[in-house]
């Protein structure tokens, strides 16, 4: 099956572990979920035939859960517990680790300078964002008022883009979250945590941008 003309967001939802494959190629399937596979492959200089073959292999496996068929209230409850609560745990710990690494290894050429600042900015951005979703947007959707939520959804999508831009800066500062040979245990653990946080955030944004918001706006 040809996947090249399909949007990344749709592929991430319909093919098991496609999201992990896109992350491997640094393809944005959440905020950039509307771009086709062909366009994303061209932007990242990826052989379209190779990634299509990889997707075909993944597609042979049964999908764990098709969120496109799950009631919106259940999706919202899942987002809050699986992603919002998790981000609230992840980011303060990562900020503490980054503060320590930047202080202890200040003289190392590969130290991720500015990482604490950017993680703090992401934490503040997401804290405000998630609170607005939980207090304003999610209750509207649960009450069947999704069609009236065009404004709040537009704001949330814009804030998703801003969070994505901060993640890009964090990836740049950390050399794509790759620890240097001299990295200590804390440094390596922090990078593992950052990778996990980015994976979670991309899944989180994809579920909202590509499933929850379109279905809410359609009046479900």
Curated annotation (Swiss-Prot):
<dbReference type="GO" id="GO:0005829">
    <property type="term" value="C:cytosol"/>
</dbReference>
<keyword id="KW-0408">Iron</keyword>
<protein>
    <recommendedName>
        <fullName>Iron-sulfur cluster repair protein YtfE</fullName>
    </recommendedName>
</protein>
<keyword id="KW-0963">Cytoplasm</keyword>
<dbReference type="GO" id="GO:0051409">
    <property type="term" value="P:response to nitrosative stress"/>
</dbReference>
<dbReference type="GO" id="GO:0098809">
    <property type="term" value="F:nitrite reductase activity"/>
</dbReference>
<dbReference type="GO" id="GO:0006979">
    <property type="term" value="P:response to oxidative stress"/>
</dbReference>
<comment type="similarity">
    <text>Belongs to the RIC family. YtfE subfamily.</text>
</comment>
<dbReference type="Pfam" id="PF04405">
    <property type="entry name" value="ScdA_N"/>
</dbReference>
<dbReference type="InterPro" id="IPR012312">
    <property type="entry name" value="Hemerythrin-like"/>
</dbReference>
<comment type="subunit">
    <text>Homodimer.</text>
</comment>
<dbReference type="InterPro" id="IPR019903">
    <property type="entry name" value="RIC_family"/>
</dbReference>
<dbReference type="Pfam" id="PF01814">
    <property type="entry name" value="Hemerythrin"/>
</dbReference>
<keyword id="KW-0479">Metal-binding</keyword>
<keyword id="KW-0346">Stress response</keyword>
<dbReference type="InterPro" id="IPR023742">
    <property type="entry name" value="FeS-repair_YftE"/>
</dbReference>
<dbReference type="GO" id="GO:0005506">
    <property type="term" value="F:iron ion binding"/>
</dbReference>
<comment type="function">
    <text>Di-iron-containing protein involved in the repair of iron-sulfur clusters damaged by oxidative and nitrosative stress conditions.</text>
</comment>
<dbReference type="GO" id="GO:0030091">
    <property type="term" value="P:protein repair"/>
</dbReference>
